[in-house]
Amino acid sequence: MRASPVHSSLDPRARQLLRTLISRYIRDGEPVGSQTLARHAGLDVSPATIRNILADLEDAGLLSSPHTSAGRIPTATGYRVFVDSLVQMRPPGEGEVARLRAEMSSAAGTQALLGSASELLSAMTHFVGVVSAPKREQFAFRHIDFVPLDARRVLAILVFADNEVQNRVIEPRKAYEPAELERVANYLNAHFAGRALADIRASLLRELRHARDEMELLLAHSVELAEQALAPAGDDMVLAGQTKLMGVQDLSDLERLRELFEIFASKREILQLLERTIQAPGVRIFIGEETGVVPLESVSLVTAPYMAGGQVLGVLGVIGPKRMDYDRVIPLVQTAADVLGAALDPNPPTER
């Protein structure tokens, strides 16, 4: 976590009061008054001194006073200072880590793993779990087959090294005979199995420049079919637990919930937000307006990239109210990212 400029200007008593107030508010969901802080902050100061410090924190934009209460609640800036400088991590226990590892088994296919990760994050936080899918071009393909569907359409069946199977309908510029499709599939399987999709097209084009006669025709056919069959698929993500937000007190406004569910359905804005975090190591936290997406201004997003084979594949995280238990959610998200990456790694450390 980075040090907040606002935090660095606070004295130890103000930091302790701010942490105690935000922790109590996260736990209880009620504005916190000076009497409560006097009992729980562990400071040997009078309620009057506490009130003065709270007034200073409010002037600094870290707290606000609801009109209906004498207590105070944190602002988005207050939460930012909290997660940057005052959070006290509570890593998941042995049982929780064992559950993550057991349910994100490397024996499952990638899509099943992503589904398990999002479901687990939702179940363990009671908020929304989200996982961006790895870009398929980062994966090696194991086998390809072409099946003619009609005069102009061909079904490409791709089997990847992580046991995922994708079916893609392509429309080549020319009609291919079954024997031609078989020759192209045999060529691609013999020469490119085990290679990442992103590498194959460039290699085909290089070989085509140096080929002659019959080999040139085979390579030309391979380039055309591979260009469509192995093209990058659209980005996607897996969400779980969206309906759990309906029971969150802070998100009880129906119009706000409707806008949130529209964002979940379209996926585009959340994918763009996750893309912003993919190259940043460690946990990233967006609080309210920091997301840059109006319907997400009432929530926080805690994310971490997951890696396999030294390569960042995607991002996972939790979407919940700003009043979430950051002490627990932050290390849980990081642990889940580590476990998912290990499950996706084709060469885990124990096998190297």
Language model regions located:
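Generic N-terminal leader/targeting and pre-domain segments
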Residues: M1-V6, S23, Q88-M89
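Short alpha-helical segments that sit at the start of domains
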Residues: R2-R19
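A short glycine/serine-rich beta->alpha loop
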Residues: S4-V6, L63-T68, R323
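Conserved phosphate/pyrophosphate-binding and hydrolysis machinery centered on Walker-type P-loop NTPases
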Residues: H7, D11, P31, D44, ...
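Helix-turn-helix-type domain boundary/helix-start signal
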Residues: H7-S8, L43, R72, K174
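Alpha-helical hairpin
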Residues: S9-L10, V45, P74, P92
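Intrinsically disordered, acidic Ser/Thr/Pro-rich low-complexity regulatory segments
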Residues: R80, D84-G317, P321-R352
